[in-house]
Amino acid sequence: LVEAGRSPNIEILTNARLETLEGEPGQFTAGVHQEPRFIDEDKCTACGTCTMYCPRPIVDLYNERLSISRAPHIDYVQAIPSSYYIDPKVCLRINYETCNLCAQTCTAQAIDFSQKPRKLSLDIGAVVLALGFGRIDQSVLEKYGYGRFLDVVTSMEFERLTCASGPTEGHIVRLSDKKPLKKIAFLQCVGSRDETCGNGYCSTVCCMYAIKEASVAKEHNADLDIALFFMDVRSQGKGFDAARERAEDKYGLRVIRARIPRVDQVDGQLALTWTTDYGKSCSELFDMVVLSEGLNAPKDAKAIAEIAGIELNHYGFCKTSVDSPLVASRDGVYVAGAFQGPKDIPESVTQASGVAAMASELLSEVRNTRTVTISYPEEDKT
């Protein structure tokens, strides 16, 4: 991403959305709406002073609402461009004109409340839709106690808890009392392979990311007792099954074939009850329950499909054919990554490479007609 941001032949439009797409392959015209950042990205040094002085707290969406940020902020350290922006929905200056602390304290004079939305018209040859995936609806999570019990968390929230740059600086603790964990349960296939929520497909990534998160947790605390409740183990990918077996042996992860119907709270702990393959009823208490969320279609998939003139399948992902999995239903429009269907990062990167080759073939006649070459002054050898 950093390399792409530095390339003179790649233009990154942030805070932007596609509004229209007209024309034919090789000669598309895209109408783009770009929202203002209210901070000049050329002047901003990302020092963080504006965030420090801003009196308006907001939930940090990047940290899965587990920490607090401010109206002027940067989503994460490696964000492109490496500059802050102001959330217009919560900024006191934009909504009520009652505050100007960020502008008064910015030594780079980067705050610019005069910025307005822009309408852009772009001449393009091909379109690649890489919208990513959407989140499972919260109503699916609620039957497991999510939202009622603080120690029932999603896999994304647990990922941030294990991260050194996360809200707890990598210390895995109970959210209810901030005490260290002793027992963790992972529940698989939450929002996947479940016709009651309309998602009958396997999300393909949940088994392996649960194994990874459990392994990371054991590296943080070797005394943790971790149980993973699977309906079926589907570690899809080259060498993934062997990697799963190594993790189970190395860290002593317990793999239990059962589908948990609900989560109860007993004396401050979380109670799980299940039936084994042999009909035996079991129950156990845990300090934290992690819900391994499946991958949903992007929430704006329908709107983008109407604008781009493409079709979606009955699950809301981009409709493609078996023999052309990277080609959408409109000529010149391609798809890559989880918008085509649930998949992991390596497969998404592979698809992106394939799409780049197909787009390059489509535009072969005009190749290198708009490229820019960086020139450097000659070295002074005297």
Which residues make up each language-model segment?
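Residues forming the flavin
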Residues: 1-382
